[in-house]
Structures are given as C-alpha cells and as structure tokens.
UniProtKB/Swiss-Prot annotation:
InterPro entries: AcsF (IPR008434), Ferritin-like_SF (IPR009078), Rr_diiron-bd_dom (IPR003251). It comes from the Eukaryota. Pathway: Porphyrin-containing compound metabolism; chlorophyll biosynthesis (light-independent). The lineage of its organism: Eukaryota, Rhodophyta, Bangiophyceae, Cyanidiales, Cyanidiaceae. GO terms for biological process: chloroplast organization; light-independent chlorophyll biosynthetic process; photosynthesis; regulation of tetrapyrrole metabolic process. Belongs to the AcsF family. Catalyzes the formation of the isocyclic ring in chlorophyll biosynthesis. Mediates the cyclase reaction, which results in the formation of divinylprotochlorophyllide (Pchlide) characteristic of all chlorophylls from magnesium-protoporphyrin IX 13-monomethyl ester (MgPMME). Pfam families: Rubrerythrin (PF02915). Its cofactor is Fe cation. This is Magnesium-protoporphyrin IX monomethyl ester [oxidative] cyclase. Keywords: Chlorophyll biosynthesis, Chloroplast, Iron, Metal-binding, NADP, Oxidoreductase, Photosynthesis, Plastid. It catalyses: Mg-protoporphyrin IX 13-monomethyl ester + 3 NADPH + 3 O2 + 2 H(+) = 3,8-divinyl protochlorophyllide a + 3 NADP(+) + 5 H2O. It is found in: Plastid, Chloroplast. One of its GO terms (cellular component) is chloroplast inner membrane.
C-alpha cells in the first residue's frame, strides 16, 4: 500500500539582475600608495569580522510562512529573490577580484576577499529565507550560466561604492522604521538589518578609499560628469523599481515614494563626502522629472510604447543637466 505524503515543492528560480566583470589586469596595476593607510585601516576592520555570528536563524523563523496570503507571499518572495541575487552578484565579483589581485596587489585582494565573505553570508541567509516561502536559488547554476556586463575598473568603483552606500541607507531605514513600529515587522529577517547594513557601509568605505587613492577619479571635469551619471543611474533605477513594488512596502508600513526620497537624500549626502559634485535632489524640477520618468516607465511596461520610451530618455537627459551641487569645497567641513 502506498502512503500519500504532502510535500512543499521548492522552485528553482532564475532571475535577471546584472552580474559584472572588469579588466582585472588593469586593476592590478593601480597604485594605492596615496591612500594606503586608510585602505589598511578598513581592511583591518574587515579582519575583525564583527558579524561572524550574526546571521543565525532563531525560533522566530520556525513558522509555516507558506500560509501567508498568496498576494503578500508573492511580494516577499520577489523581495528576497532580488536581494539574494544582488548579494550573490557582489560575492562573485569580489571573489574574482580577490583571486586575480592576490599576487599583484595583496592588500586590495585581502579586502575584496573579506567583502566576498560578507556577501556570501548575506546571500546564504537570504536563500534560507526564500526556502520559507517555497523558493530557492540555484547559486551554482547562476555562477555558471549568468551573462556578465563589462565595466571598466573605475566605473566598477563608482557603481559599487554607490550600490553599497544606497544599500546601507535602505537597510537602516527599514530597520529603524520597524523598530519604531514593530506591528509592521511581519517577517523576522528585518531585525537583522541593523548589523547587516554595517557590512554595506564598510564595503562602501573601502571603495571610497580606493577612489581617493586615484585623485583623478574624483577631481576634474570628467570625474564630475561620471559622478553625476552614476548617481542618477542608481537613483533612477531604485525609484523605478520600487514604485512598481508599492505593495511590498505597504506590507511593512512604508510608503515607497517617501522611503525612496529619504534614501536618495541620505545617499546623496554620503556621496558628497567623496564626489566633487552631487545631484540637486531637492530641486523642484528634479522631483517632478523623477515622477514623470516613473509614470512613463509604468506606461512603457504595459504598452511597450516607443513614445513612452522616448519620454523616459527625455526625462533622464533633463535630470542630468540640472545644475549639480559643488561639494569639493566642503570636503573638509562635511561631517
């Protein structure tokens, strides 16, 4: 006689975030002597591994999360999937940088090795959370079959610096909101965000130190253009993505638009400590154009309209040419 056993099916999900690669030989040639002391200090902080025992699941996870209403569960699954894939992407990049730089630039290699450790820890923790909702990522498959986007080394540093800093502000903002309003903490992963975000912050500081070791990357007219470009790219990407996922933020008691503007302003303030210019994110036209861009993007997703796509690019151009804020003169006074 056969016994019927009801099991939960775990779906292997393949996502489509960006995975990056770069010119490792060129990166190996970079001279970091101009800011070596700061880089060494940050690597020493990495060695201490403050979060070694932080990412351990406790009894709060021991619930049947698949009984959550399907609409809510779907938003959580997507949040966890996107977060896990982003962390895993960072792990792959940092691990490869550590391996390639081991012989030519051992200090940077050590720093990237510690950051890959952190990212792997984050990705693994998120993947376990995904299993609570009946989903998991085949990280080995992702490693072998992902398409990689090539970025020149200095662009990798701009992009990852901002990615880590915006990640810090996202995590700490969610944590502080739920700490103040615990009734919205509907899943226990958020209580880990306070220490988790410190990993992101330290990673951002490491990239900032590398950028400062190459003064031409943060001074001069070309660097001003590139800093504006990457700031705008990161802010617009987050804004368009999050406004498409308002329901998730409502689940945890946040307004997606207000949350994003807070994160944008805080990340812009952080970047002002490093970049020679930042965006005037409080300019009335900046706010208006961001909203117009989001509306055009939502319409394009529904219709694939060429006019909507043209509207998006027009908004992006207008956003880019808004006069930036000169921060270089304030570097010695910003706290």
């Amino acid at each position: 006689m056969q016994t019927a056993v009801q099991t939960q099916t775990t779906v292997q999900t393949l996502l489509t975030p960006r995975f990056y690669t770069t010119d490792f030989d060129q990166m190996a040639k970079y001279d970091i002597s101009k800011n070596r002391a700061e880089i060494e200090a940050i690597v020493n902080e990495f060695r201490k591994d403050y979060n070694q025992t932080h990412f351990i699941r406790d009894d709060e996870f021991d619930q049947v999360w698949t009984q959550m209403p399907e609409s809510k569960r779907q938003w959580f699954k997507e949040f966890l999937e996107r977060s896990c894939t982003a962390e895993f992407s960072g792990f792959l990049l940092y691990k490869e940088l550590s391996r390639r730089l081991k012989d030519t630039n051992p200090l940077l290699a050590e720093g990237f090795g510690y950051m890959s450790r952190d990212e792997a820890r984050h990705a693994g923790f998120l993947n376990k959370a995904m299993a609570d909702f009946g989903v998991s990522l085949d990280l080995g498959f992702l490693t072998k079959h992902r398409q990689y986007t090539f970025f020149a080394p200095k662009f990798i540093f701009y992009a990852t610096y901002l990615s880590e800093k915006i990640g810090y502000w996202r995590y700490i903002t969610i944590y502080r909101h739920l700490e103040a309003h615990p009734k919205w903490s509907v899943y226990p992963i958020f209580k880990f965000f306070e220490k988790w975000c410190q990993d992101e912050n330290r990673h951002g500081d490491f990239f900032a130190a590398i950028l400062k070791a190459q003064p031409k990357w943060i001074t001069g007219w070309a660097s001003r253009l590139w800093c504006r470009f990457f700031l705008l790219s990161v802010f617009v990407t987050m804004y368009l993505n999050d406004l498409q996922r308002k329901d998730f933020y409502q689940l945890i008691g946040l307004d997606a638009r207000a949350f994003d503007w807070h994160v944008i302003r805080k990340t812009n303030e952080s970047a002002a400590r490093l970049f020679p210019v930042v965006l005037d994110v409080d300019h009335v036209d900046f706010v208006r154009l961001m909203d117009e861009c989001a509306c055009a993007y939502a319409h394009w997703r529904e219709t694939q309209s060429v006019l909507s796509l043209a509207k998006i690019f027009a908004c992006l151009f207008k956003l880019y040419v808004i006069k930036p804020i000169n921060t270089q003169a304030l570097w010695n006074t910003i706290k």
